[in-house]
C-alpha cells in the first residue's frame, strides 16, 4: 500500500468512525429528550392514577359527568373484575361491530370518492387490528378506506383502544393501592383516560404536525404533472395530521399511507421524526415513572425507568451498529452503512432508534423498510417484540411490567427464604399462577402459529427471501400480532385470508386474554390489607432487584424463542459472516 492509498484508507476509516459516534450521540439525544418530557408528564399521570383532580379537571370534569349521566354510570359505582372486564369487552365488541359494518358499506357513505374497498377477511383483520391497539395493516393503498372510514373508524378506534388500555392500568393500580374489594368503574376510567390525558396531548401534537407541514384536509388528492415522464399522477391527501397525532400519542402505529412514517406526508424531516418518536414514548415511559409517586417510593419508579432504558439502549445500539456495519461481502454500506429502504433525510441512527422505540413500546410505526434491514439490525428491533414490548402501550406497559415484577419477586423470595410481597401486599399462589399464565401466553401465541404456517406449502410459496429469512419474517409477523404491536416486516403477501384471520385471532387473544389475567390479579390484590408502610420481604426498588428483573425478562422473554432466533436471524447473520470468511480465504 503506497502513501496515497494509505492516506485514503485512513480518512475513510476516520469518517466512518465519526459517523458512528455522531449516530450514537443522536440516539442518546432522542432518549434524553423523551425521558425529560416523560418525567414532567409523570406527575400528571400520577394524579390520574390516584383519582385526584388534574389541570384539565375544571373543563373535563363537566364533560365526563355529562357522559356518565347519559349512560347511567357513576365513579362511585365500583366494579369487581367480572363486571369491569365484561363491560370492557362489550364496549369494545360493539365498537368493533359498528366499525366492521361501516367499512363494509363505506362506498354508500359520505366522502367515499374512488375508494377500492376491502374483502371481508381484510375488513375483519383491519377492525380487530385497530380495536386492539395493534394497527397491523395488511393493506398499503390509502384508497382502500374512504375519508369517512379513516376519520370515524380508524381514528375513532385509535382513541378507543388507547383509552381502554389506560383504563385497565388505572384499575390494576387501584387494585394494588386500595383494599375496597373493587377495581373501579370502567366507563369512568375510560372517560378520564380520554379527556384528561389522551385528547389534550393529541390536540397539541396535531397543531405541531400541521405547522410542520403535514396535510390536514378533506380534499381527496392533488393532481401532479411529472416534468420528466410527462405523466399525470394523483397523490392522495386527507386528514393526515389528526390521524398521525393519535397514532403516536395512543401508541397505535397505523399510518394513513402504506409506507407509514417513511412517507413524506406523514414524516417529512428530522424534526417531525423526533416529535413523533417522543410522542409515542412519552405516555408509556411517564406511566412507569409515575408509579414511584403513586406508591410513595420514588426509587421504585427510577428502578423501572433504568430497567426499561437498559433494553432501550441495548436494542438501539445493537440495531444501529448492525445497520451501520452493513454487509461488507456484498459491498453493502461499507462506508455509508446500510441505507437500503431508509430515507436519506433521516439516516441510519434516526431510523433505528425510531424502529426500536416502536417495538419497545407497542406502537409499531416505521420510518424505514424493515425487510431491508441486515440480520443484526433486525435482531435489535425484534428483541422488543419477543419481550412483549417492555415499555408497552398506553396503560398496557404498566400491566406487562408488573407481570414480570410479580414473577421476579416470587423467585427472589424463594432464593433468600422469605415470603413474597410487593407494595406491602402478600403475593399468593393465585397471583403467581395468573402472572405465569400471562408470561407464557405470548410465546405460545407466537410459536404455535409459526410452526403450523411452516408446514403449509402454498403459503410458503408467497415468500421471496431464503429459508432463514422466511422464519424471521414469520416470527416477526406473529410476534407483532400477539404483542399488539403492529410493526410489519413484510417479505411475503400478508393480505391472504389465512393471515388475515389468523393474525386477527392472535391480536384478540394477545389483548383480551392477557388483560383478563392481569385484572384478575388486580381484583385479588384489592381485597388484601397492606402491612406497615415501607415493610417488604425484599427491597423492590434497589439496583439488585432491577438486575434480577432484567434477568427474568431475558430468561422468560427471550429464551422461549431461542431455537427460532437461531434458525432465523442468527442463521442469516452467521451466513453473512461465513461468506466474509470465505472471501477472506
Swiss-Prot record:
Pfam families: KdpA. It is found in: Cell membrane. The keyword Coiled coil does not apply. GO terms for cellular component: plasma membrane. Its main location: membrane. GO terms for molecular function: P-type potassium transmembrane transporter activity; potassium ion binding. Signal peptide: none annotated. InterPro entries: KdpA. Keywords: Cell membrane, Ion transport, Membrane, Potassium, Potassium transport, Transmembrane, Transmembrane helix, Transport. The chain crosses the membrane at residues 23-43, 85-105, 152-172, 194-214, 275-295, 307-327, 345-365, 367-387, 397-417, 444-464, 502-522, 547-567. It comes from the Archaea. It is a multi-pass membrane protein. Part of the high-affinity ATP-driven potassium transport (or Kdp) system, which catalyzes the hydrolysis of ATP coupled with the electrogenic transport of potassium into the cytoplasm. This subunit binds the extracellular potassium ions and delivers the ions to the membrane domain of KdpB through an intramembrane tunnel. Belongs to the KdpA family. The system is composed of three essential subunits: KdpA, KdpB and KdpC. This is Potassium-transporting ATPase potassium-binding subunit.
